């Protein structure tokens, strides 16, 4: 049994409602993909720390899935014993209640990615110790989220042509 399969099995045992799949990428590396409910998300993150106290939180990525907002975490486990285990944890929240639990008390670096998710798609990480904007200026309008694909995304009148050569329209003289 590979380390990835071992991690997947332990997650399945502890979280029977989670969707857990081991996939092999085109380079032959195994990845463990987990889809977890927001109610069990924080407990899963604590469990990951139990499995590997040195687990490395790589990145969190916010996503707009139509009716839901998602947050995809990449964590590397057992990296000091090659090959490490690449773990991807996907959690979703409905757009009408986009609340997920903060996990920065477990993985402190996750806070910067949570802050990005708050300002870019409108996720709310309940209990986050710092909810200040990370990238957007203070005068950017509240309730508009640059990576949303619905009516809360950037309206057309805010979009300006920054001069990209493929988008410029030249006037004919």
From Swiss-Prot:
Coiled coil: none annotated. Its cofactor is Ni(2+). The keyword Cell membrane applies. It catalyses: H2 + 2 oxidized [2Fe-2S]-[ferredoxin] = 2 reduced [2Fe-2S]-[ferredoxin] + 2 H(+). Disulfide bonds: none annotated. Its EC number is 1.12.7.2. GO terms for molecular function: ferredoxin hydrogenase activity; metal ion binding; NADH dehydrogenase (ubiquinone) activity. It is found in: Cell membrane. Pfam families: Complex1_30kDa. It is an enzyme of class 1 (oxidoreductase). GO terms for biological process: proton motive force-driven ATP synthesis. Belongs to the complex I 30 kDa subunit family. Beta subunit of a hydrogen-evolving hydrogenase that utilizes protons both as a substrate for hydrogen production and proton translocation. Acts by coupling the redox reaction via ferredoxin and iron-sulfur (Fe-S) clusters to proton translocation across the membrane thereby conserving the redox energy in a proton gradient. This is Membrane-bound hydrogenase subunit beta. The lineage of its organism: Archaea, Methanobacteriati, Methanobacteriota, Thermococci, Thermococcales.
């Amino acid at each position: 049994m590979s380390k990835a399969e071992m991690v997947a099995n332990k997650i399945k045992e502890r979280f029977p409602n989670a969707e857990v799949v081991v996939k092999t990428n085109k380079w032959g590396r195994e990845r463990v993909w987990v889809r977890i409910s927001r109610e069990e998300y924080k407990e899963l993150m604590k469990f990951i720390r139990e499995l590997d106290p040195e687990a490395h939180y790589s990145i969190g990525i916010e996503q707009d899935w139509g009716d839901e907002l998602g947050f995809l975490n990449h964590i590397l486990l057992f990296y000091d014993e090659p090959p490490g285990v690449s773990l991807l944890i996907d959690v979703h929240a409905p757009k009408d209640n986009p609340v997920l639990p903060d996990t920065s008390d477990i993985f402190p670096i996750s806070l910067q990615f949570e802050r990005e998710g708050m300002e870019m798609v409108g996720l709310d990480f309940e209990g986050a110790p710092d909810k200040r904007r990370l990238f957007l200026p203070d005068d950017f309008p509240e309730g508009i989220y640059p990576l949303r694909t619905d009516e809360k995304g950037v309206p057309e009148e805010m979009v300006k042509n920054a001069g990209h050569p493929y988008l410029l329209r030249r006037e004919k003289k």
